[in-house]
Amino acid sequence: MKNTYYITTPIYYVNDVPHIGHAYTSVASDVIARFIRLCGFDVMFLTGTDEHGQKVEKAAINKNIDPQKFTDHTSESFRHLMNVMNISNDDFIRTTESRHKEAVAIFWQKLLDNGTIYEGFYEGWYAVRDEAFFDESELTSDGLAPTGAPVEWVKEPSYFFNLSKWQDKLLEFYEANPDFIRPISRRNEVISFVKSGLKDLSVSRTTFNWGIKVPNNEKHVIYVWLDALASYISALGYPDKQSNYGKFWPADLHVVGKDILRFHAVYWPAFLMAAEIPLPKTIMAHGWWTNEGQKISKSLGNTIDPIKLIDEFGVDQVRYFLMREVTFGADGNFARSNLVTRINSELSNKIGNLLQRTTAFVYKNNDGKVPLLMQGIIDKIYELPILKTASKFAEQNILLMEKTEINKVLENIINLSEEANIYIDSEAPWNLKKTDPEKMSEVLYTLLEVLRYIAIMLQPFIPSSANKMLDQLGVNKEERLFKHLIRDYALRAGSSILEPAIIFPRFEGDVV
């Protein structure tokens, strides 16, 4: 059985500072990476920055700085975002690194040697903002790219990749691998695009300089998307099969925004087929965010700075909201009031309140120790409906994550916490101390065990807070994987818990 897993974010374009979309993609990828690690897999999680191209060159010129200095600064802002958002990436690739440039040159030469690249002359529409070529038929009635980006007519010598040759092979691959593109709506869009006819793709430019030079013809720079996509293999050490490339490729999951799906689901597999490299297993395209129902744009002044959000609300609170608020793959709306509601109603009232009530009662009434139980009682507890629900959700969540139904995993966890809050109210352990102390011990143990399940399942989403919960419950650091969510690793009777501390404070600031 394969015990490795390779997941990537897109490498982010450095023409501007990070925004909420970058944060969302990074957190979603991080949640999946952490989840897979907790399943016992050896995970490689890659993120990084895409630093070449005409758009970056223009941005640097506009600021009157050298492109390398410009990209150094902007790339660092993305690295800072990863640190602040507690992203657990194993590597951070920059396309200006020598390891990447060397791999791209080898990749280009392989395509050339295989007869899939040829010289010609390009004449057509190009959107600098998208770093993409568009056919006349794809332009809007206003003469813009489908994304709304302005286009310009480009005429220049160019190398071409024979994309048209791969049309049928791509369609055959999509048919044979229905999970290659998710969600299904995006898969259908890609298939429709490919069926409409693929034209050979210009893969070099001569009208600007900021990029990787074409080997043996330095008048040309390699098309930024061929350059960028190759980062997924260059970061692993391509073409050395004794490196991580041999260990982790093909990728298990590329997480991308829907706006760059064509590059990943059409161009990338075609390049790989042409270079005789195995294709990634799945490309997951998520939606866009709006701000209070409005499209986010600089001109409207409604961009969302994820760093400021974290400063105000806390990193785990923002991570939780991003993953809970929207079905992964669909568009989402950022509303401050919804963020506050998620924090106060779910994290604080449901999970935090359950943790606080239970641990405070145990600490005060049971000397801060997991209750001692009569022989066989733990087996009996595991037959209770609430523990059966916990076990069921633990199994369900693995299946849900395999389908990248991230918010449904959180929904299960919240439902379990709601059931536990109902349980504590109905059993009222505070009334049992004098009348039935053995029953009180059973109730408290049950609640602590449910909290163990909740905390272990929350680790991918809110790692810092979840681990504080596990510390508070006295769970060994070596027993926090998903395989430990069984009766054999139940809390040890008589073990100590930490003095209760508030992990999920309510947000008392402005709601709007």
UniProtKB/Swiss-Prot annotation:
Output the PANTHER family linked to this UniProt entry: METHIONINE--TRNA LIGASE, MITOCHONDRIAL, METHIONYL-TRNA SYNTHETASE
Q: Which family does it belong to?
A: Belongs to the class-I aminoacyl-tRNA synthetase family. MetG type 2B subfamily.
Q: Does this UniProt record's set of keywords contain Nucleotide-binding?
A: yes
Q: What is this protein called?
A: Methionine--tRNA ligase
Q: Which reaction does it catalyse?
A: tRNA(Met) + L-methionine + ATP = L-methionyl-tRNA(Met) + AMP + diphosphate
Q: Where in the cell is it found?
A: Cytoplasm
Any one Gene Ontology cellular component term annotated for this protein: cytoplasm
UniProt organism field: Rickettsia felis (strain ATCC VR-1525 / URRWXCal2) (Rickettsia azadi)
Q: Which CDD domains match?
A: Anticodon_Ia_Met, MetRS_core
UniProt record, GO biological process = methionyl-tRNA aminoacylation
Name of the gene this protein is made from:
metG
How it assembles, according to the record, is:
Monomer.
Going by the UniProt record, its keywords in alphabetical order are:
Aminoacyl-tRNA synthetase, ATP-binding, Cytoplasm, Ligase, Nucleotide-binding, Protein biosynthesis
Q: Tell me, what does this protein do in biology?
A: Is required not only for elongation of protein synthesis but also for the initiation of all mRNA translation through initiator tRNA(fMet) aminoacylation.
Determine if NAD is one of this entry's keywords: no
Q: What is its main location?
A: cytoplasm
Q: Where is this motif: 'HIGH' region?
A: 12-22
User: Gene3D superfamilies annotated for this entry?
Assistant: 2.170.220.10, HUPs, Isoleucyl-tRNA Synthetase, Domain 1
Question: What EC number(s) has UniProt assigned to this enzyme?
Answer: 6.1.1.10
Q: Which residues bind ATP?
A: 298
List the HAMAP family. Answer: Met_tRNA_synth_type2
Spell out the InterPro entries in the cross-references: Anticodon_Met (IPR041872), Met-tRNA_synth (IPR014758), Met-tRNA_synth_2 (IPR023457), Methionyl/Leucyl_tRNA_Synth (IPR015413), MetRS_core (IPR033911), Rossmann-like_a/b/a_fold (IPR014729), tRNAsynth_Ia_anticodon-bd (IPR009080)
- Note the Pfam families from the entry: Anticodon_3, tRNA-synt_1g
